[in-house]
From Swiss-Prot:
InterPro entries recorded: bL21-like (IPR028909), bL21-like_sf (IPR036164), Ribosomal_bL21 (IPR001787), Ribosomal_bL21_CS (IPR018258)
Coiled coil: none
NCBIfam families, per database record: L21
SUBUNIT field: Part of the 50S ribosomal subunit. Contacts protein L20.
Descriptive protein name: Large ribosomal subunit protein bL21
GO terms of molecular function: rRNA binding; structural constituent of ribosome
Lineage: Bacteria, Pseudomonadati, Pseudomonadota, Alphaproteobacteria, Rickettsiales
Family from the record: Belongs to the bacterial ribosomal protein bL21 family.
Keywords from the named record: Ribonucleoprotein, Ribosomal protein, RNA-binding, rRNA-binding
GO biological process: translation
HAMAP family for this protein: Ribosomal_bL21
Pfam family, one: Ribosomal_L21p
A GO cellular component annotation in the UniProt record: ribonucleoprotein complex
UniProt function note: This protein binds to 23S rRNA in the presence of protein L20.
Length: 105
């Protein structure tokens, strides 16, 4: 069984026991989170349920396995011939989740 969930403004396709990295979610390691914004749910051999915009009664349960930071990206702005340069870096904080269960009532 698989589902498409919305987390942190992005969409993720998840299976049971899959591991995903999403934008930071506050919580301690080992705590469980439920996603009720399920956009689609289905099985590979049967037709899927597509939400309008979400599937009612569908819940995805996940466990926080790690809190980490992504690789650093460099943002560099420049205007030619004007001696204008700006350099900034950014490291996005991420949460690693293990999908435990996908249910639809």
């Amino acid at each position: 069984m698989f589902a498409v969930i919305k987390a942190g403004g992005k969409q993720y396709k998840v299976d049971r026991n899959s591991i995903i990295k999403v934008e930071k979610i506050d919580g301690e390691l080992g705590s469980k989170i439920q996603f009720d914004q399920v956009l689609m749910i289905g099985e590979y051999s049967k037709p899927s349920f597509i939400g309008t915009p979400i599937v009612k009664g569908a819940v995805v349960t996940a466990e926080i396995t790690n809190q980490l930071k992504d690789n650093k990206i460099i943002v560099f702005k420049k205007k030619r011939r004007k001696n204008y340069r700006r350099k900034a870096g950014h490291r996005q904080e991420l949460t690693e989740l293990k999908i435990l269960d996908i249910t639809k009532q």
